[in-house]
Amino acid sequence: MGEIGGNALDGIHARVRTAPLADQAAIAAVRQRDRLLTKPPGSLGRLEAIVEWLAAWQGKSPPVLESAAAVVFAGNHGVAKHGVSAYPAEVTAQMVANFEAGGAAINQIAKANGLKLSIVPIDLDRPTADIIIADAMSVQECAAAVNLGASVAAADLDLLCIGEMGIGNTTPASAILQALFGGPAHIWVGPGTGVERDALTNKIRAVESAVARVIGTDGTSPLEFLRRLGGREIAALVGAIIEARHRRIPVLIDGFVATAAAAVVHAIEPGAIDHCLIGHLSAEPAHRRAVQALGKTPILELNMRLGEASGAALAAGIVRSALAVHTGMATFAEAGVTDRQT
């Protein structure tokens, strides 16, 4: 995505609405080969659909996975000072250092699944404004974060897994989802890093206050919700999703916070996240509600709530297996196996 000048948010809207469509010829070619493989039709379930998805958005059959990556965006939040997380804000920078040293869960998962890992900290010494009383970002700050996220969608990637790190960021994610989909705050708020009882009540009140400040004002487009309620890492996730679509890169979305970013894009144009699959269903209670609102079915359900693109990176292993089956299996003719009677 080129640098967006002028009315930056309008430029981002336009970018979403001019996204390329799925390659129907590639889908048809995958289905044709699948019918010839030594198995009953449909017997590999979602693995077959995953290969069709890869082909549709890469625009080729067979699809490939020669260059796959995971990206973790990190940001800090002014609302964290209200005790909405079990951890202090300095943990964001400390975890970025841990990522860079190779000591986090995502480092191990990315390595195990053949993913190049990138960590993108965004102005950690400059938290967003406290969303209870002020807009999180200016238009320029939001657009800059979107552009930064877009820059990770390199043209040579075959698959992109995206996630985040940011103490307190399930609070802005919950606020975005409530603003987009409605309902009371408590159905969109969960424990995040492990808050409970009074701290959880405090988190719900923070989301209620933030959304009440925004709803009914002029700035209520999806990107305005992102700007006013979100965070830099969430905006970067939005940029990565949008640019990946234009570069025909299939995307695996991580958990609750990354899904909130996908929801922003979906709210602009529902088909604009068709190139995305949800890697896993988070243990964060509202994640199920969010993915249902997007019409998505997560690939995995492992009771995880870590973030860090960990669930998306694990799902990349399923995607690799699906493609290996599709490209490596013999056809009935090649194997000398009698096909089903018709």
Swiss-Prot record:
Q: Which domain of life is it from?
A: Bacteria
Q: Which InterPro entries match?
A: Nict_dMeBzImd_PRibTrfase (IPR003200), Nict_dMeBzImd_PRibTrfase_bact (IPR017846), Nict_dMeBzImd_PRibTrfase_N (IPR023195), Nict_dMeBzImd_PRibTrfase_sf (IPR036087)
Q: Report the CDD domains cross-referenced here.
A: DMB-PRT_CobT (cd02439)
Q: What class of enzyme is it?
A: transferase
Q: List each coiled-coil range.
A: none
**Its catalytic activity?**
5,6-dimethylbenzimidazole + nicotinate beta-D-ribonucleotide = alpha-ribazole 5'-phosphate + nicotinate + H(+)
Its annotated pathway reads: Nucleoside biosynthesis; alpha-ribazole biosynthesis; alpha-ribazole from 5,6-dimethylbenzimidazole: step 1/2
Pfam families given for it?
Answer: DBI_PRT
Q: Where is the active site?
A: E308
Q: What is its EC number?
A: 2.4.2.21
Q: Name one GO biological process term.
A: cobalamin biosynthetic process
Supply the alphabetized keyword list.
Answer: Cobalamin biosynthesis, Glycosyltransferase, Plasmid, Transferase
User: What is a single molecular function from GO for this protein?
Assistant: nicotinate-nucleotide-dimethylbenzimidazole phosphoribosyltransferase activity
Instruction: Give the family from UniProt.
Output: Belongs to the CobT family.
Show the HAMAP family listed in the entry.
CobT (MF_00230)
Its biological purpose is as follows: Catalyzes the synthesis of alpha-ribazole-5'-phosphate from nicotinate mononucleotide (NAMN) and 5,6-dimethylbenzimidazole (DMB).
Q: Per its record, how is this protein called by name?
A: Nicotinate-nucleotide--dimethylbenzimidazole phosphoribosyltransferase
Q: What species is given as this protein's source? A: Methylorubrum extorquens (strain CM4 / NCIMB 13688) (Methylobacterium extorquens)
From the UniProt record, report the name of the gene that encodes this protein.
cobT
